[in-house]
Design a protein with these regions (language model features):
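Charged, amphipathic alpha-helical linker segments immediately N-terminal to NTP-binding catalytic cores
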Residues: 1-8
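Substrate-engagement module of ASCE P-loop NTPases
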Residues: 122-123, 128-155
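Conserved inter-motif catalytic segment of the P-loop NTP-binding fold
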Residues: 58-123
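Glycine-rich P-loop/Walker A and Walker A-like loops and their local beta1-loop-alpha1 context
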Residues: 13-67
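Long, compositionally biased, glycine/small-hydrophobic-enriched stretches that function as flexible linkers
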Residues: 204-290, 299, 451, 507
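Phosphate-binding/switch region of NTP-binding enzymes
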Residues: 1, 151-207
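Conserved mixed alpha/beta core segments that line enzyme active sites in large multi-domain catalysts
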Residues: 275, 280-283, 287-326, 381-741
């Protein structure tokens, strides 16, 4: 069958610019993406040049994406559009820039990409290289373009090459034998010939198939001997960097290499897997070392960054232990796992959610389609190689309860807390291995889906973060605590702030810090349930409570306890007396007092009411708990050079020692709209609108006020209840008016 260089409609077919190669491939089709697998860019150039010149000679629009470090493939001034891009802006931004240029170029455009292998080097990730191709290739195909890509042979993992092979229309292996160049088509969609998949030698303008077995074996055996071994071919860019780091660390410790080499690799790995936020980079460079980063990798699933929550937890622990070695004994050992941010993007790409993700970068349409994308995320599947790593992690934890926590790139950084915007879910981790895996996968999906919630998207929009890379990593932590009957929970948990903004007495020192303390899981301290109380503890005056009155202990004490119900395999809230009834081994007197003892006055003999009241009195006065927390918060504040916000649990061991589990640390966020300031010393009387004396609950802030709205209380009270909501709506409309300058 002769090759015909026209389509069925009689129009001229696309071409590689090499008629002999067109004949081998049975011609190009609109939408073809051609990937050249080469040993070096010098083997890519002989195919790019004729493609470029043929396209321009035909009057085709030709676009060249220039982003790699190798020599330029398409020179300026010949009629091609050249887009110079930097992969260092991150996967999401880089991909958005490429797609925008493709959209603007329209249908039937011809493209040349620099070698894709440089993207893996800049992103430290073969996984993201595969993701880039999987979201870009179909887009080009739909627009009936013809596109050249290149990939360096034996530089990428099987998973990455497999993703590219499965997506492209044409994959060609290019190699040299002696002085001659060979092409070996490995995949050609919708075309076939008896000799298409043989190696072809290029000579005299034509490509001739090697069909004789003796010649084939001679050429291919020599080629195989020159290549790296099979084990090395399975390693991606990430693995190679980590192996190099481990080798350098060992040789530095042996005195074979200078310490400067370890420092340089540490800096690269820090940006590769921990953080690229400059303030956190500076902090991490001071408190972490290369061995810390290698330890992180051992407990990491996938590649990418570990996210803000993980960084805060690891940094805080390192700061404490290196400032005062006694904290190594005070802290509960953590054995957390980290799901890298690249897994999030991979999940979105492979479940068809990338288009919705891309649309979120538009400030006008970022909410459009978010709910549909969220539903798709909740029903998506994980790639097999990721699931296998999840299974191995769950085998490690056994049936110990775990918590799956959001740890996005921007979360818990300086200036962006994302408090409560992303989900974190407990997994009681009971049942068969398959049931536990299913529950864990559902939790990961829920965390990923929370990135598409309207609350999270509006928060990002309000803070100007819509066009920023916001990848979701995940922190998987063992839940701190112990089994008590059919329940699992820690003895105490809480939120600790190094600066106390709630000064309810002139005896309170704000710099001493404050703790919001609960019995059981810390969810009640973090979420502050409306139907219950937490214990507020000023760390310089722990017994001075904000509540007033003689009965302040029983009346304002915590009544319900958040626990994991192992028999029901779920999170639960139980009454304090019910929890105590199944927990006989607890050091109960540290946390609670009998209600009868508290209600009975001096000299009274009649029985008081039954049950227990959580007072924490002995914990606060007879143990080292308060001074330990005050020291912890002070050390972290000084290291951050900024107030900090922490989450922790604590358990007393049978020998009386207290172990603190520091699960989170981040810069203390100030409520939007102002900064913490010292109040002015003197304000003219005629400039005062409102004045109050006494303690101020919360932080002083300095804000620009556009307008003051006054609602007459008598007139408001006279309104029917059903009409009062209209006043609130009117105030909202006024507040949304443009600022007056």
């Amino acid at each position: 069958m002769a090759f015909d260089a026209t389509t069925n409609s009689g129009t001229e077919s696309p071409s590689t610019g090499l008629p002999g190669l067109d004949r081998v491939l049975r011609g190009l089709l609109p939408g073809d993406n051609i990937v050249w697998q080469v040993d070096g860019v010098e083997d890519y150039v002989p195919f790019v040049d004729p493609f470029v010149h043929d396209a321009l000679a035909r009057g085709k629009r030709l676009v060249y994406f220039r982003f790699a470090r190798h020599l330029e493939l398409v020179p300026p001034g010949i009629g091609a559009e050249i887009h110079r891009l930097s992969p260092e802006v991150g996967f999401e931004t880089f991909t958005a820039q490429i797609h925008k240029a493709i959209e603007e170029a329209g249908r039937g455009t011809y493209y040349v990409f620099d070698c894709l292998s440089d993207l893996a080097a800049d992103w430290y990730s073969d996984l993201m290289l595969g993701n880039f191709f999987m979201v870009t290739c179909p887009y080009l195909y739909d627009l009936e373009t013809v596109t050249f890509f290149a990939l360096f042979r034996d530089c990428h993992s099987f998973d990455a090459v497999s993703a590219i092979r499965g997506t492209t229309q044409i994959l060609i292996d290019v190699f040299r034998h002696g002085e001659r160049l060979y092409v070996h088509p490995l995949k050609v969609d919708h075309r076939h010939s008896p000799t298409m998949y043989f190696p072809h030698v290029w000579g005299d303008g034509d490509f001739l198939p090697l069909t004789e077995s003796a010649v084939l074996s001679e050429v291919l055996v020599e080629l195989t001997e020159r290549r790296v071994d099979a084990v090395s071919r399975t390693l991606d860019m990430w693995d190679r960097k980590l192996l190099q780091a481990r080798e350098v660390l060992e040789e530095v410790e042996l005195g074979i290499r200078p310490e400067g080499e370890a420092t340089e690799i540490f800096r690269r790995l820090l940006r590769m897997m921990v953080t690229r936020d400059e303030r956190l980079v500076a902090l991490a460079s001071r408190w972490l070392d290369l061995s810390d980063l290698l330890a992180i990798r051992k407990r990491m699933i996938g590649t990418g960054l570990i996210g803000g929550k993980s960084v805060g937890m690891l940094l805080a622990r390192a700061i404490l232990c290196r400032t005062n070695p006694r904290w190594k004994e005070r802290l509960e050992t953590h054995d957390s796992y980290y799901i890298g941010s690249d897994v999030f993007y991979t999940y979105l790409v492979r479940n068809g959610c990338w288009r919705a993700r891309r649309e979120q970068r538009n400030v006008e349409t970022f909410l459009d389609g978010a709910e549909r994308a969220r539903e798709r995320i909740l029903s998506g599947d994980f790639p097999g190689f990721i699931r296998e790593q999840f299974v191995a992690m769950l085998e490690y934890f056994g049936q110990s309860p775990i918590i799956v926590r959001s740890s996005s790139l921007l979360e818990d950084s300086f200036g962006n807390a994302f408090t409560g915007k992303y989900d974190s879910l407990f997994c009681p981790n009971q049942g068969s291995p398959q049931q536990r895996l299913d529950a864990f996968l559902s939790a990961v999906r829920a965390v990923y889906a929370s990135t598409m919630s309207s609350e999270a998207l509006l928060y990002r929009s309000h803070r100007g973060l819509i066009d920023r890379d916001e990848q979701m990593a995940i922190l998987v932590q063992r839940v701190s605590g112990a089994v008590h009957g059919h329940l699992f929970y820690p003895q105490v948990a809480g939120v600790g702030l190094s600066y106390n903004p709630y000064v309810w007495s002139d005896q309170i020192d704000p710099e001493a810090g404050v703790v919001r303390l609960v019995f059981g899981l810390g969810t009640r301290a973090v979420d502050r349930a409306d139907d219950d109380y937490t214990r507020m503890v000023s760390l310089n005056a722990p017994l001075r409570r904000p509540e007033a009155g003689r009965d302040r202990g029983p009346a304002y004490s915590q009544r319900r306890v958040d626990v994991l119900d192992l028999s029901a395999n779920r999170f639960s809230s139980e009454g304090i007396d019910d929890v105590i009834a199944v927990s006989p081994e607890l050091p109960l007197r540290l946390y609670a007092a009998k209600r009868s003892d508290l209600s009975r006055g001096a000299g009274e003999t009649r029985p008081g009411p039954a049950g227990w009241v959580l007072t924490f009195e002995r914990l606060l006065t007879e143990t080292s708990f308060v001074p330990d927390l005050r020291e912890m918060l002070g050390i972290l504040r000084d290291a951050y050079e900024y107030p900090v916000d922490t989450e922790f649990t604590a358990n007393f061991l049978p020998d009386g020692r207290c172990r603190v589990n520091l699960v989170q640390c981040r810069p203390l966020q100030v409520k939007e709209g102002g900064n913490i300031v010292e109040p002015p010393k003197r304000i003219p009387r005629d400039a005062l609108v409102l004045e109050s004396r006494g303690p101020v609950i919360g932080q002083s802030s300095l804000s620009l006020i556009d307008r003051i709205l006054y609602v007459d209380p008598e007139a408001y009270s006279a309104l029917p209840v059903r009409e009062r909501g209209s006043i609130a709506r009117l105030i909202g409309r006024i507040n949304r008016l443009p600022r007056e300058h």
